[in-house]
Amino acid sequence: MASKEPAWLAFARQQIGVREIVGPKHSPVIMGWVQRLGIKVLGIKVVDDETAWCGTFVAMCMMIAGLASPAIAVRASSWATWGRELLGPRLGCVLVFTRTGGGHVGFYIGEDATHFHVLGGNQGNAVSITRIAKDRLAKGGMRWPAGVALPAVQVIRLNAAGVPVTVNEA
């Protein structure tokens, strides 16, 4: 019997295809998340969808599930100390990655031999599923919400065919 997806991941899947609008106009969906989360959750004032919004997306998914976010949720690196650290993946766990000039955060949906398959925001300027190299996972960068029952380790093997690889989510 397949395990039920966490509420935050179910919401995240519903958002696949939401895109930022490059230039002077901004996505009403993304800006709606920014407005709903506000400075108190995001930690800074966000005025456009040009600001890196992977952390905003994860925070919105957690809010929908009734869960708290880290102090400066807009920053991907803030998620590396949020909740509890995992030593093995679970469907929907938060993955925090390093990259030149910043970081990235998204949700585990599976993996192949060399990459995690990540559902996240601001991946190619959209909510999408992409592959990110396992060696980019930040120290302590596999996380689970505090106070939420922890399922068994769940390695989900996926085929890499047709899933793009990203090296810079900015």
For every predicted segment, state its role.
Residues A2-P6, V47, M63, L67-S128:
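...with weaker cross-activation on analogous glycine-rich loops/strands in unrelated enzymes
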Residues I21, S27, L87, G110, ...:
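Intrinsically disordered, low-complexity, compositionally biased regions/tails
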Residues T114-Q154:
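Active-site signature of cysteine proteases
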Residues G32, S78-W82, A138:
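Solvent-exposed, non-transmembrane amphipathic alpha-helical segments
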